[in-house]
Every structure is written in structure tokens, then in C-alpha cells.
Amino acid sequence: SFNTAEHLLALQQPNSIKKIIVEVPKSAKFNRNFVKIMVSNSKNIPPSLKKKFKANIVVVYEFGACEYSANVKQTGDYKDHIAMDVGGKPLRSLKIKLKNGNVLNAIKFKLLLPETRNNLNEVLGSVVMRELGFISPETFQVKVDVNGTESIMLFQEDARKELLERNLRREGPM
């Protein structure tokens, strides 16, 4: 809903993102999957319940919004990646793969429940590592709305080619 050429610098800054909205059209199946994870006997999230769902992602900036098609799925090994908010609505850590476009040059990223990464300690750790010259994924706190359930989550880009490019490195053999 805006001319990207006018906002190129702002599109590269995490603080220009006001909110990320995740809409899963098949929300009944998405919620049923959440319940199956909750009631499973294991402390771990069974891999069979980490199903992909088609979703629409809207990234709201100070100056407009961008819409993307995506696949989302449950991420995390342990059940600390799922929770209920005060009103009893489901919260979960998500892995998102955009089918078109990117957010801060990331095509794949995670929206994590803050408790799974010791809240802001993960953000502090990534900033310190970056300042020391290490390659570190873009990590920051952001408002998120998943099917109408609002929460604060951690955005963390996946360790992929875009991470290397952002750190002025090239892909190659190690």
C-alpha cells in the first residue's frame, strides 16, 4: 500500500515494523493441531504434529503494509513453544516461509514465544555477537496477531543465504 522506493531504508530497519499479522484460512485445522500438541503425552512436540498450513502474512509498517502468501508451521522441540494467553487463546512459536517477497531480506523466519528464549536475553545476545563481529541472525521483539490472538513475540531470521548477505559474506564451502 506504499511506494517501496520511497521507503528503502525504513524497510531494512526492524523498528519500522509495527505489527505482523498471520491469518491461517483453515484455522479450525490449525487450532485442532494445537490441541493435539497440548494433549500429547510427550514433553516434546511430536514431529507428526508440525504440519504446514497456508497463511497470509501482513507486515504493518509506520508508512503502510505489505501482504504475502506463506506457509506456517509449528516450530520448537519442547512444549514451551506452545501456551495459552490470559483469555485461553492459543499461542505458539511459528516457522514462516514466505512464497513471495521478504521481510528485512528474510524469506524464512521464526516468530518465537519470548519465554522460549529467555525473553529479551536472546535479543541482547544477538546484538552483542554482532557487535563482536560474529554472524548473528536479526532478532527483535515485535507485536504479532495470529488469527486474532495478539501477543509480543521474537522475530528471528533463519540461518540462510540472506543472513550471510546481510553480514556482507558470500555463500561457499566451509
Predicted features and spans:
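Phosphate/dinucleotide-binding and metal-coordinating scaffold of catalytic cores
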Residues: 1-174
